[in-house]
Amino acid sequence: MRYITAGESHGPQLTVILEGVPAGLTLTAEHINKELLRRQKGHGRGRRMQIETDTVEIVSGVRHGMTLGSPITLIVKNDDFKHWTKVMGAEPISEKESKDMKRTITKPRPGHADLNGAIKYGHRDIRNVLERSSARETTVRVAAGAVAKQILSELGVEIAGHVLEIGGVKAKHISNLSIEEIQTITENSPVRCLDKEVEQEMMNAIDNAKSSGDSIGGIVEVIAEGMPIGVGSYVHYDRKLDAKLAGAIMSINAFKGAEIGVGFEAARQPGSKVHDEILWDEEKGYTRRTNNAGGLEGGMTTGMPIIVRGVMKPIPTLYKPLASVDIDTKEAFQASIERSDSCAVPAAGVVAESVVAWELADALVEQFGKDRMELLKQNIMQHNNYAKEF
């Protein structure tokens, strides 16, 4: 499967086209809108989320609530476009039009794609860069992830995410929770955290950053249960599932690190404490005593829960802007200010769930059958029986 997104932050709409989704998948706008609403929530979101009411329109690939196997097109309208129709219009603008009308930006923001993107594509107006590099694009990536989650759900794979850290405030490790329990707790937390004791402390950190014109980042974790053993491959570098998951996490705006299982902690421990001992019993087949590998070894699933974490840096748009240089005059200035969040870690966790879900669903479809859900389910059932008796 693959998808491609299109659209600008303040353009008329965002679009995603999904190719390779099997026929026979139950899919409605309601499924997708639930995920879009989750992305809009979270303590620390800015005024843009008060303007937009993200809802999806399915315009191809689905008939009467069932996928057809043909490309699926999803669109999400930008409600704020009505205030930007002249600024973001597709028609040419007369030389007489003022820079104010175009809302031209010549002062790049440190930490954003602004300067590098302007140099790469030759844009003298940085708005041409920031409109596409904006995290607003993740709206339709979450829509794509909602489709992937629906595939996973029908195949018995469940996924959940939660926030581990915000602005240096760390949640305690809470184990032995089911995916359903994680989902219930996080949906009732303003910061999507499992540790109620630090929830308010995280919110205070966000509020303090906002009041001082600053921003803060954090760490999110995604867990998926129910993946069969042996999904992915050790044969080629680009078929390793852990590599695909790490790449997916790193593709999210402002994410600067990814780890799987114990991750970087593995460098500090001896092998005897890192590697997961193999067990077998008649009921479960092969399993592991521990899950330090995060459900992945040699680029393939082990049958244990998939555990992926991502590190999000503080959002670069600051209301207390850093020093920059005007690309027209080369004079030192304070960077431009665009409407933004003070902390988007809780929302980014939803995006992380979406990209992980997509990679897992893609791997299953690729390995067990591309055309229709019925065949996919049969093949996975046969594989699970085979792996158990192996």
Swiss-Prot record:
Organism: Bacillus cereus (strain ATCC 14579 / DSM 31 / CCUG 7414 / JCM 2152 / NBRC 15305 / NCIMB 9373 / NCTC 2599 / NRRL B-3711)
Function in brief: This reaction introduces a second double bond into the aromatic ring system.
Entry similarity comment: Belongs to the chorismate synthase family.
GO molecular function, one term: chorismate synthase activity
GO cellular component: cytosol
Subunit structure: Homotetramer.
Pathway terms, separated by semicolons: Metabolic intermediate biosynthesis; chorismate biosynthesis; chorismate from D-erythrose 4-phosphate and phosphoenolpyruvate: step 7/7
Keywords: Amino-acid biosynthesis, Aromatic amino acid biosynthesis, FAD, Flavoprotein, FMN, Lyase, NADP
Binding-site positions, FMN: R132, S133, S134, N253, A254, G298, K313, P314, I315, P316, T317, R339
Underlying gene: aroC2
Manner of cofactor binding, per the entry note: Reduced FMN (FMNH(2)).
Matching HAMAP family: Chorismate_synth
Amino-acid positions noted as binding NADP(+) in the UniProt annotation, renumbered to this chain: R39, R45
InterPro entries assigned: Chorismate_synth, Chorismate_synth_AroC_sf, Chorismate_synthase_CS
GO biological process: amino acid biosynthetic process; aromatic amino acid family biosynthetic process; chorismate biosynthetic process
Group of enzyme by EC: lyase
Record-given protein name: Chorismate synthase 2
EC annotation from Swiss-Prot or TrEMBL: 4.2.3.5
Membrane-spanning intervals of the chain: none
Cofactor field: FMNH2
Keyword Nucleus applies: no
